[in-house]
Amino acid sequence: MSGAESLASSPLNDLSWWHADADERERTFARHRREDPRPFVRVSAQSESGFWALTRHEDILEVSRRPEDFTSGDGGTQIFDQPAELREYRGSIIDMDNPEHARLRKIVSRGFTVRSLQALRSDIEDTVREIISELPADGRCDFVTDLAAPLPLRIISNMLGIPREHEQFIFEATNVILGASDAEYIPDQTGAGINKAVTAASVGLIELLEDLAKDRIANPTGDVISQLVAADDENLTPAEMAKFFILLVGAGNETTRNAITHGMIALTDHPDQRELWRADYDSYAVSADEEIFRWATPVIHFRRTVARDGVMLGEQELTKGEKVVLFYNSGNRDESVFEDPYTFDVTRNPNPHVAFGAAGPHFCLGAHLARLELQVLFKILFEELPDLAAAGEPDLLRSNFLHGVKHLQATYTPR
């Protein structure tokens, strides 16, 4: 494959490949979409085991719509099976199949309807303005830790009824859990070191939840935790609630903060698009929002497992137990679906991106909340800090699962 490496010869579990050259990586995925869209990637040159890498938008959609053939509950949804000692904490609804998945999703979705989230708009607006008021007075900040991370974290904390004093702990714990392959968050990068740190962070979050749940049973407030512990036959078990809590505080702040940060980088790098949106915000609010999610693709991949022998994907026959990895980053650059996919275009419409997963039972539960947070945030930023811009290169998370940004210097004229 001249001009690009082969995915099959460059294992996608090799973190150095993901961080060596972004342009080379994009060329590799593009070449595969054209010539070899479903390569079998071996975990090492000496191993026969591996996974099928799906690089085309249509394959990602198809697999997502066929949960009876491609399961989520067999070993988890990341490339490698989770260690047994972590499954107790990490197995949430994203790692389940129906009917259990449908039962739990119905319960936890009570607090995430479009109607209930629209009622949060004023809370989000107030939170954005509060965060802006806390920015350093010298006109320089770490956009991630000072702005992008606090917004979704405070909103999800408010929804759950988590007191503000726990905010920093949740930020640090979710960094450990979702950024486990990065030495900034877990210095001991041995398998034992990672498992120990992730377990400790997970246990800390569960202990926080247990304290909150006990309080809500005695003193219900109407927040999401109060709804989940309300006495009815469909309630979550304590173990189910613990896993959901870890998922919600993690996905509810990590993925959104990364979309926000990549959005700021894109708007800085494409000032014409920034000005177009700023000058007529309402006309482009929805399309710009969706383009940021496509451009960012905060979650790089999820995995499915083949449910039985003889499952067909296109002309490829698959075997029970084989792993199939959906590379959303590649699907969101598919030239057969998106015109000029490497162009950031706030007017792009339609925009059938797969940044929230694809159609099917596992479409992101928090998609509506994430969209609302971005729409509100950038509107207020354009009004309050019109010259806010990224300054320098982002410090990227070492991961092949999350397209994360740990730090991003930014400048602005103080208010």
List each language-model region with its residue ranges.
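Cytochrome P450
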Residues: M1-R415
